């Protein structure tokens, strides 16, 4: 996989989505010399970070014909990780002290993340490449090129041919629903975190929240402010778990998984506890879903594994004309988007070559066999966990990009440890000022900020 000889080839590329992945993909593709068109159905950049109070009429997302609301952001959402490790490599996510309307907290709100993405788009003139209010209807291979059919908000249709398509459309819109024995006869209401915005609808209810990571931890505590009782069912908990959690209203309990649901409205947990619940909130993640993508049955999503996909990016027989940015689940999301985009851009230009189709398929076969031997379920194929930095550094070496910084890696590790150990307070109480200082000193050394790090470090929480 050595660098290929010149000349550099300029491709006509469609990027699907103008969220955090699509924005940096567009920048990297243009930097590499490609012509780029970004297609996005919304009126502004930001993707899932654009908050809307609207939710889908089908709260479980079971109706394939439903109008889809792509945002999953709830009103009280703050980031799960420190801001300094979230940003792109050369555009740090630092406080904007010159603007009093901005959120300078280390774990800021979703509004601040959106503002950061808007700043990024402005800084690199990305909006000039974007067609807003454009819904992609179909993407398919045609004679070695890619046909993209779309329609605008005004009803105009487009049928265009591109050299390549980069999929940056996210994977937080198709809810994954827990399978519970007896749920079909249970009379209560069910919803998914995708449709959660504010706690008000749960006032005085007994609520069961399934899942206790990130959104589950947040939403259960948000609901506890108004609910009568909140009971969290967690697959990670031992079977006999029954623990009261410290929240102001003293009304939050942690359980093991749900065992059964019953027509009398009761929910039975595997710890033997029984509650009569009004609502179940599924905080159980999302499915990968690409309804407009036609690959002549070459690709599929099987048990939430997108396959075949070399290094989570390239479908071997369709590469490099089709690629995916942002599929792996990891802490360093924006950074990953940037590194993956650099690789895609370099491959499309011919500056970096991919292995042969057979070599990529052999690599995938070995990867899947290793995963199975380790007992890792297929549905976790795109969850990189502790191997995320190894993955990113491997791609970085291909593109001549620096490895993940020590402070960035450790902020993610320690940040998630705090989330698990102190879910009520982790955003405002931390013990890694050394890493934060290292990050800001790094930004200053690279001339990425125009103020001394102490200005923020001494400002407190």
From Swiss-Prot:
Catalytic activity: a (Z)-omega-(methylsulfanyl)-N-sulfo-alkylhydroximate S-glucoside + NADPH + O2 + H(+) = a (Z)-omega-(methylsulfinyl)-alkyl-glucosinolate + NADP(+) + H2O
EC number: 1.14.13.237
GO molecular function, one term: flavin adenine dinucleotide binding
Regions that span the bilayer: none
Entry keyword annotation includes NADP: yes
Assigned keywords, A-Z: FAD, Flavoprotein, Monooxygenase, NADP, Oxidoreductase
Keyword rRNA processing (UniProt): no
Residues that coordinate or bind FAD: 17-22
Pfam families associated with the record: FMO-like
Induction field: Up-regulated in roots by salt, osmotic and cold stresses.
Residue positions binding NADP(+): 211-216
Recorded phenotype for the gene knockout or disruption: No visible phenotype in leaves or seeds; due to the redundancy with other FMO GS-OXs.
Gene Ontology biological process terms, A to Z: glucosinolate biosynthetic process
InterPro entries named among the record's database cross-references: FAD/NAD-bd_sf, Flavin_mOase, Flavin_mOase-like, FMO-like
Domain of life: Eukaryota
Similarity-based family: Belongs to the FMO family.
Primary role: Catalyzes the conversion of methylthioalkyl glucosinolates of any chain length into methylsulfinylalkyl glucosinolates.
The protein's name in its UniProt record: Flavin-containing monooxygenase FMO GS-OX4
